[in-house]
Structures are given as C-alpha cells and as structure tokens.
Amino acid sequence: SSEAQVPVLRVPRGQGIIGAAIESGDIIFVPNVHADERHFKDAEPITGITTTSLIAVPLITQAVQLGQELGSAQPQIIGGLEAINRVDGYFTTEDADLLQTLAKQAATVFQIAKLYGDANELFLDTIQAMVASIDAKDPYTNGHSQRVSEFSVAIGKQMKLSPEIIHQLRIGALLHDIGKIGIPDTILSKPGHLTEDEINTMKQHPAIGANIMQNVRLLRNEIPALAEHHEHIDGTGYPNHLTGDQISLFGSIVAVSDVFDALTSDRPYRAALDVEEVLNKMQKDSGSHFDDACVQALIKAYLAGEIKTQKDRAA
C-alpha cells in the first residue's frame, strides 16, 4: 500500500553484490543470487523479502570540489542502485539501460545536495573568518559576536520562529558588528571610556556594516541585524533613530542579545554585571529601548538554560 514502509537495511561497505558493483564500477547481472557467494544473506530476515535475481549498477557522478579549477571534475562512484526479482524472467540489457538512467538521475540529486552542503559550509566558514577578524581587532569583546548569535537563536526559538528564519537570524547576529572593520583600531582597543568624538565614530559601525553587505544577495535578509541593532523603540538609538515597528524583528532581537552580552561580560573599565541585575534593567527598559516580546523571550531562554554568559562559560 502507499503507507507501507521498507525496513532500513545497512550493508557493510564492500559487502554484497551491490558492494561489488560499487567497487568495480560495473553493471552486475545475477540470475540466481543464492548461487553467488557475494550475496548478502543477512538482508532477507530484515526485509522479509526473498531475493532470487537482481541487477546492480553503480551511481556515478562527476566529483566537483569547491575551490578547484574549472575542468577538475572527475568521475566518482558514490553508491549503487539495485533492482531485484524481475517478474517475468531474467533481467535484460534494456533493464540495465533503464536502471542506469535512474542511477544517473539519483547520482545527480545526491551530488547537488552535497554541493549545496559544501557551499553552505564554505559560506559559514567565511563568515566565521570575517567575525574572527573583528574579534582580533577588538580583544575586549573576544567571542562577543558568537555569543550574540547564540543568544539570538535562543530568543528566536522561544518566539517560535521557523528554522529558515532562525538560520538567517544566526548569520545576521554573527555579522552584527562587522562594520567595526571600518573603525580605527585605536578606538576599538582603547582601554577606557571613549571621548565624544570617538563615540560618534563608533556609532558609524552599523551603517558601515550594512553598506559592506548590501550587495551580497545571500545576505539581504540579514542586513537589518547589522543596521538596526543599536536602534531603540523610542527613537533614541542610532544610526537612523528608528521607532517602534520601524525596527525589524532581527534588529530588535539582536539589540537585546547585544546589550545582554555586553552587560554580562567583563570590560576593561568594569566587571561583568550580575545576570539578575541585567535582566531587571532590561525589563525596565522594555517598551522604550527594547521590544518587550524579545526581552521576555530572552528571560525564558536564560531560565531554560539555553543561554550561557561569558562568566558561565569560564566557570
């Protein structure tokens, strides 16, 4: 029936007739599997299906590695496809042609999935490298971007955001301070309070970050996290003095995560504040500086053990 489930069967690498097809790269016809010593006999008790005959073909695709020169793709066997128990007689060359066609389509799908995974991993690694370069410029906030990203994800989960949105939020939060790459090192690494001019220079980093990333099409949904994480509900934030609903959800979430991490982390001019004190302060500022729903989600995430401060991690 349409609801029938096929048991999961794992054949050890190199075993079975399908293993022989994968290792050799050849199409294998077997009219009587029980007369073939390569037959994987443990399959039938698991599947409940008695195999009499079969045909096995390798899944062959072009191995493409990101970062390699064009033209470097080489044929690669990534698996195998097997058909069993032809109803009327033995398997034919026509059956082999059909199975090879199906195998090529399956191999293409698998290869696309792998390339997507590789590209996504490369993309995330590149972002991590960019963030690490910012942390290297500002030693007093080492690990800040990673923590803000993790806090933002925890808030997003408490707010029941979809996995796709949370993935975008994770990246946007990770990149929220990327604009500091345009701020002089003398300001970033200054061990003490900044002058008014230095503060005004530092306030440019959200706009700098948004400008850097605005032409990266893959990041267009994440840019509000970069541009708006210092905006306040009452319009007293920067750089654009946005108010209320003018501030995006990403901007609101990252604003809460950013301040929570800043206040619960050590700085050269003060020690980390107590978490309870910080949460009370942020609750008082809800509706003026912070979006109340985001603050409540932060509190729930912290009480659920989903958020670890800098001090927690060092313990």
Q: Which residues fall in each region the model found?
A:
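Signal-transducing coupling segments at domain and membrane junctions
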Residues: 2-9, 14, 31-57, 61-73, ...
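Heptad-repeat alpha-helical coiled-coil signal-transmission segments
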Residues: 106, 112, 119, 123-126
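Interdomain signal-transducing alpha-helices
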Residues: 21, 25, 54, 83, ...
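Soluble sensory domains of the PAS superfamily and closely related sensory modules
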Residues: 20-28, 34-37
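Regulatory loop-to-helix N-cap segments in sensory/regulatory domains
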Residues: 40-41, 61-80, 84-102, 194-195, ...
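Short amphipathic alpha-helical signal-transduction/dimerization elements
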Residues: 22, 34, 88, 100-111, ...
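Metal-dependent catalytic cores of enzymes that make or break cyclic nucleotides
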Residues: 4-8, 25, 48, 65-72, ...
